[in-house]
Amino acid sequence: EQNMADDKLYSRLGQMNMGGIGTAVNLPKAKRYFEKAAKLDNPDALYVLGKLFLRKDSEYYDPNKAVDCLLQAAQKGHEFSAYALGKLFLKGDEVPKNVGCALQWLEEAVVKENQYAEYLLGKTLLMGVDTEQDMERGVQLLTASAGQKNCCAQYTLGKAYLEGVLLPQNIPESIRLLTESADGGFTPAQYLLGKLLYRGEIVMRDIGRALLYLEQASEKENAYAAYLAGKIRLTEEGFKDVPKAVRLFQIAAAQQNSFAEFQLGLLYLRGKDVARDEREAIRWLALSAEHGNSYAARLLHSIKSGQNWSAALGALRLLQHLSRMIQNRLEDERKGTAGMTERKLKRKIDEKKQAHGLRQG
């Protein structure tokens, strides 16, 4: 009983020193307390030590020691250690990849309804990556994880139902799951849902809600969301806010988004919505061109060679319009062949199952 009390006390002291609870953060001291608790077979302490040994920004980084600690904890039934081992062995970045071992430990965690293990194993089985594809079980596990409010699982399932390739397309269920994920703060879901709401092709168009999600994703520096939100703030009547558009473009441009850089260049070049600044315009256009934007390169060439940049811009608008027409046509053709693509994918999956003796009836 004394040992039990001691191991919990040491573990608590370790948490206080690691998290700065009631004292200054002291990682070496925290490590010593966790090691004392681990020697008394405290699985939580072993887990924390394992995670500490995986911190690349720490002087204690040692994947082998991490695996040793996590194994000890997982063998004592610690579900998060089992999940951590499964993830480590599946990725194969810090320890040698071992899919069999990974699946074994993920299954151990799934038995205890660990939402993270349900998500990772479910996604692995749904995609058929590194293991035999099992879409039925993959969906089952992802659904269980999503039911525990796991944003990654909600997003993965929602996207699969949206695309209609791995799973039959189900737009209402897709939007429901993506909304739950976005409302849970998952950035990719916020961007995707915002884009869908803005386009209004498969759900009713709602620019206000679209902006809400896109700007939430922008706050977490999602470049695509920031660029799209910037375009809306720049062009959409009733939502126009040029200073906010500039800030959003700057968020995207900070991550080398060439379209945002191009928009900033245009804004400063035209001097319509912001004060004209040719030097600043050239700086942004040069960055955009450097990052692969051919329109920026052409406009920059026109400016530097003394040509009429306004006429050049008009020509670029025509090129962009033609480009959009071609893109829309290709998209229409893609949608027309979606059913064929699904049938081909299903046939390949059936052939794969037949090869493994798994095809039914």
Question: Predicted regions: what is each one?
Answer:
Residues R12-G19, V48-R55, A84-K91, L120-M127, ...:
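Hydrophobic face of amphipathic alpha-helices that form TPR/SEL1-like repeat modules
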Residues A24-Y33, E59-C69, P96-W105, E132-L141, ...:
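Structural signature of tandem alpha-helical TPR/SEL1-like repeats
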Residues R276-S294, H301-N308, G314-R324:
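TPR/TPR-like (Sel1-like) alpha-helical repeat modules
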Residues Q320-G361:
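Helical anchoring/docking segments at protein termini
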Residues K36-A37, Q72-A73, E108-A109, A144-S145, ...:
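Canonical positions in the second alpha-helix
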Residues C152, I171-R176, E180-F259:
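Eukaryotic tandem repeat interaction scaffolds
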Residues N3-D6, G19-I21, L40-N42, R55-D57, ...:
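Short helix-capping/linker turns of helical repeat alpha-solenoids
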